[in-house]
């Protein structure tokens, strides 16, 4: 159902799977949720062969400015409710400004770091993952946004920026998109993300509880 919803954005959507084949494995083996399955790797490589290992991996060699990943994480309810309206808010501005966007990747049983592999295989300078956060008693549908510059396996949480608690009762889709776009523009300018990249958005724009420029991954 989410795949069909995302397809209404007018952007190609890829259905992928982490190396965790089911929910039980996902919960017991967090490492597998951070990797793509062999079939998903093959599917991406068939579309876009890996870069020549003899060529330096620089931002200039990447083919896309941004890859977007949507993963269920610990709350499929969050992505089911908020991924589409959030992207409906974010994407028009990116398209208008000429951002080169990779296909949207919908990853089942995915954790935050799976975006690093997706972003690298799609040759994107930045990767954004929308992921369901650990549910709380008052927030069963909280969506987290994680942004990483020059994604590749092995990136650490300190190299990401996070905006959390994206939901109507927390940080609105519009305010989250504003914060994220500022971070994305600054990441492109400075060629980095993480602890050295601060969210300079004025507090009046979405200063709701749970929003932050950097957080440890809560997947």
Predicted regions, residues:
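Gly/Ser/Thr-rich loops at beta-strand to alpha-helix junctions
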Residues: 22, 73-78, 110-111, 134-137
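A contiguous pocket-lining binding segment that forms or flanks enzyme active sites
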Residues: 92-140
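Glycine-rich phosphate/diphosphate-binding loop of Rossmann-like nucleotide-binding domains
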Residues: 76-98
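Solvent-exposed alpha-helices and their adjacent loops that cap or buttress functional pockets
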Residues: 6-8, 52-62, 119-123, 137-139, ...
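Short glycine-rich or small-residue beta-strand-to-loop segments that form or flank ligand, phosphate
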Residues: 65-78, 128-130, 164
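C-terminal functional extensions of proteins
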Residues: 133-219
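Short, charged beta->alpha transition segments
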Residues: 27, 32-61
């Amino acid at each position: 159902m989410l795949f069909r919803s995302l397809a209404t954005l007018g952007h190609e959507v890829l259905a992928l799977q982490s190396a965790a084949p089911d929910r039980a494995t996902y919960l017991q083996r967090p490492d597998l949720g951070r990797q793509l399955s062999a079939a998903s790797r093959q599917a991406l490589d068939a579309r876009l062969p890996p870069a020549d290992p003899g060529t330096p991996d620089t931002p200039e060699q990447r083919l896309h400015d941004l890859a977007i990943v949507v993963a269920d994480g610990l709350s499929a309810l969050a992505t089911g409710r908020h991924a589409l309206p959030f992207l409906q808010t974010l994407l028009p501005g990116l398209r208008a400004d000429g951002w080169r966007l990779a296909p949207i990747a919908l990853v089942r049983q995915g954790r935050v770091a799976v975006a690093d592999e997706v972003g690298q295989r799609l040759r994107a300078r930045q990767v954004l993952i929308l992921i369901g956060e650990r549910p709380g008693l008052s927030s069963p549908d909280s969506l987290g946004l994680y942004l990483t510059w020059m994604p590749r396996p092995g990136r650490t949480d300190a190299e990401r920026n996070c905006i959390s608690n994206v939901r109507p009762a927390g940080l609105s889709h519009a305010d989250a998109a504003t914060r994220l776009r500022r971070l994305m523009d600054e990441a492109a300018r400075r060629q980095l993300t993480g602890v050295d990249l601060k969210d300079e958005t004025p507090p009046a724009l979405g200063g709701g509880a749970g929003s932050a420029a950097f957080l440890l991954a809560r997947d």
